[in-house]
Design a protein with these regions (language model features):
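Extended, charge-enriched helical/coil interaction regions that scaffold DNA-processing
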Residues: 1-223
Length: 223
């Protein structure tokens, strides 16, 4: 059974990774990528760009762990992002995309800060259902969509799911008894109803007629 230990600098050495582990080990890479130049687990800034095939904002091309002053928390964050990107679990959950690493770190840190503010220290062993319910309530009270609330709660589920790959042991109980995150947001369904007003039929009809006319009579020059 995985045990959870308080996060302190004595726990800042990974039981599972070595500094030379390649961060993008399981990711498809762009043609011409020099594998010798890829970011390693021991680096405090991970370059995700070699595994990005579409344009992304500069901020999302790297994951910067150097902003975390506590060495043990920095290790937890590294193991969390590394495991989510590279480890395949039997539950079939998709792995973290490199372009999402920046956001995943931000949402993790937000939850860890909440834990510290509630119990006075960062100790995942003291995280219980009441605490994560309070965290969900905190985000539901914000002026954000239910989908965004779900994103904010995702670290809770992942800290449990990835516990075997975390030196500190992660969250040992099953959050919300295994219910999907979107139900914990109070949303009730996976997708909320689209409340955008329908385009009036006379308008959409005219648009379709012009589209068909263009395809049938006016677009020879593009074929």
């Amino acid at each position: 059974m995985t045990t959870t230990s308080p996060l302190n600098d004595e726990r800042a050495v990974s039981r599972l990774r070595v500094d030379d582990d390649i961060v993008l080990a399981s990711m498809p890479l762009r043609d011409g990528t020099d594998r010798a130049a890829l970011s390693r687990f021991g680096d405090d800034v991970w370059d995700m760009a070699p595994a990005m095939f579409n344009m992304a904002r500069k901020a999302f091309r790297t994951v910067d762990f150097g902003v975390i002053p506590c060495a043990a928390e920095r290790l937890l964050a590294k193991e969390y992002i590394y495991a989510w990107m590279n480890e395949r679990r039997a539950d079939g959950e998709p792995r973290l995309r490199p372009v999402s690493g920046h956001t995943a770190l931000a949402t993790l840190r937000r939850f860890l800060d909440f834990v510290r503010s509630r119990i006075g220290k960062l100790d995942l062993a003291n995280v219980d259902q009441d605490l994560i319910d309070a965290y969900a309530t905190h985000h539901r009270a914000r002026p954000i969509t239910p989908g965004r609330v779900g994103v904010c709660l995702r670290p809770i589920v992942q800290l449990h799911r990835l516990a075997p790959y975390l030196t500190c042991g992660g969250i040992t109980f099953t959050p919300w008894r295994g219910r999907p995150v979107y139900r914990a947001t109070g949303q009730g369904t996976r997708c909320s109803e689209n409340r955008t007003a329908r385009i009036p039929e006379p308008v959409i009809g005219a648009m379709l007629r012009w589209a068909l006319k263009y395809v049938e009579h006016l677009c020879d020059d593009i074929f």
